Amino acid sequence: MAMKKLLIASLLFSSATVYGAEGFVVKDIHFEGLQRVAVGAALLSMPVRPGDTVTDDDISNTIRALFATGNFEDVRVLRDGDTLLVQVKERPTIASITFSGNKSVKDDMLKQNLEASGVRVGESLDRTTIADIEKGLEDFYYSVGKYSASVKAVVTPLPRNRVDLKLVFQEGVSAKIQQINIVGNHAFSTDELISHFQLRDEVPWWNVVGDRKYQKQKLAGDLETLRSYYLDRGYARFNIDSTQVSLTPDKKGIYITVNITEGDQYKFSGVQVTGNLAGHSAEIEALTKVEPGELYNGAKVTRMENDIKKLLGRYGYAYPRVQSQPEINDSDKTVKLHVNVDAGNRYYVRKIRFEGNDTSKDAVLRREMRQMEGAWLGSDLVDQGKDRLNRLGFFETVDTDTQRVPGSPDQVDVVYKVKERNTGSFNFGIGYGTESGVSFQAGVQQDNWLGTGYAVGINGTKNDYQTYTELSVTNPYFTVDGVSLGGRVFYNDFDANDADLSDYTNKSYGTDITLGFPVNEYNTLRAGVGYVHNSLSNMQPQVAMWRYLNSMGQYPDNTNDRNSFSANDFTFNYGWTYNKLDRGFFPTEGSRVNLNGKVTIPGSDNEYYKATLDTATYVPIDNDHQWVVLGRTRFGYGDGIGGKEMPFYENFYAGGSSTVRGFQSNTIGPKAVYFPASSRHDDDDSYDNECKSTESAPCKSDDAVGGNAMAVASLELITPTPFISDKYANSVRTSVFWDMGTVWDTHWDSSAYAGYPDYSDPSNIRMSAGIAVQWMSPLGPLVFSYAQPFKKYDGDKAEQFQFNIGKTW
């Protein structure tokens, strides 16, 4: 025992004293202090084995090897005769990890970072690693301007050499920028330069992008913006000399000073293109032309490089290298641009694969492809395929990945990665207004039936005034060339009086068939035929209605409120669609134009034509497409042929969630003017117009009758949805809007009805403004809107809150 103490004391001064220069032969190895680590595992990590001759260097290597396992806080190696005694203190095992006070950083993100550093439940606690994590987290807070933040690791011992690890955060407040100074600017004012920054020392109320909270990453981005601003205006020698960020003593304020050297403005003297141009020199040189005396422009140089890469990509050169080097001549203030191009190998497509299409059949996606297998890779064709998949509306996201084929110098696989969305919707609508009360509608639509791409819909409405049923089917690829075939059958029993419209009842049924012919990538023409039977009854004597009947050779008695009429019509239906939206669901860029019309053909009782034109344009105002301006219009017009009028039941209506929000559906526009009917009883509650049997002159009502002309427009700002995580960002859309619209009757004779509103005047425009939220829920698209009408006319019916399932735009 005395010998062991002597050896321990000697170890503290010199290991050489213990083992000697020549070492000794180890006959046995004993461990002290092992709890969780097995003896066998500890022995395997040591470079020394029984029977080895051990020197001082071997002992040092043994200690290092044991520390390297990460299992021990302390290691001592002692000699007891011919036995090597290894004394260890194991690191405690982490039993639990908790967080407190963290608001800016979520628990899941913290756990991921800890696990990446090897800190997880069940592992040994490395205090050095914990200290590094503390510092790293504090550095993160400093980078986002929270200089008073602190992160402390609290380690609580538990039985059996275990510990609880708790990270306690004190995030503090973000330091706000007090002032931004730019020193050395002469050509542009400081205010002009700072106006392009994200970080600002003053943020007007209307600026939704500017931020006074300091962030290191944003400052780096702003400095790059400053550099680009000068380079794009000819300052080829522009330089940022230094940047100082000063913190106030209370760590709540930031002063930023940027020192710059503007230099002089330079002009292009020419562009020289060299290298492997793959036989496309003429096209590449056309992309690099500059005008004589044109100012040097850094953005144009970058655009040249990207355009050359895109050009070569269209011809199969998937990985070209394009480098530009400016040659600056300070004597005449010119820049000669040298562009070196290496087209590289030409690649061919071996396979096109799809991932994520669990429901949609492979053929549904493959028929949208413009890139062919076996052909050379065309980047524009790959992008067209992506755009076409997006426009289907079946997917939340579509991404492409071009993967080189191992072992092949000139082959790639093109992979389309899709995330499917619910293409079926249960269409259920509710509206509430002070005059209208509650209204309902319902239906089922499946745009990708059983993954085949067929659109199948069954829609129905059942309420106090309507029973409607419709079955529709569309095959978008009736032929291999992309000709579509669609058809529908419907039945409608409609009581207009109970719907607050002009008083009549119409029972109708019909069918139609339509073929769609793709003209090119973005244009489609449609043509088809249809049949409809209308059986009208209980028609009250109303001016516009009687005017139509007279044009049809029917001259009913003005005093009879039980008139009836029926018509069978055959129509030629036509249409045109231009669609260049970036995706079919929640688009953010591009435009869509939709023209639909019909005209009766020989054999019809009616003779008329009718057409509607819908447009929508999306313009992103930021690079991430989070802020988007949407403009929508809808125009409609119809009229009779050969002296006849368009049927009143084909009139246009406005108001409601798809036209002018804030107004009850179909209530904007002309109102019914009734003739007095002596056969109607004054106590008949089925009619609510103001005429009484004792009156002799026509009288107005609040019943909407629609018109043969319509114009609707909407301006909308789509914004990021607050309080929504990134997981649901693609499923929810928020916007503020301004709607306007009107409906008028071009045949209304204002001179004959001088005491009544002029329903032929198209300037009677209604307006509303509000907010809307759309959500692609498991049931289908949900649309909530709240709008306040601020321009309306007598007889209009407000409906501020509207809620629909199954309608998005």
UniProtKB/Swiss-Prot annotation:
UniProt keyword annotation of Nuclease present? no
Put simply, this protein is called Outer membrane protein assembly factor BamA
**Superkingdom of the source species:** Bacteria
Q: How does it assemble?
A: Part of the Bam complex, which is composed of the outer membrane protein BamA, and four lipoproteins BamB, BamC, BamD and BamE.
Hey, what's the signal peptide range on this chain? Answer: 1-20
NCBIfam families recorded: OM_YaeT (TIGR03303), PRK11067.1 (NF008287)
Q: Which family does it belong to?
A: Belongs to the BamA family.
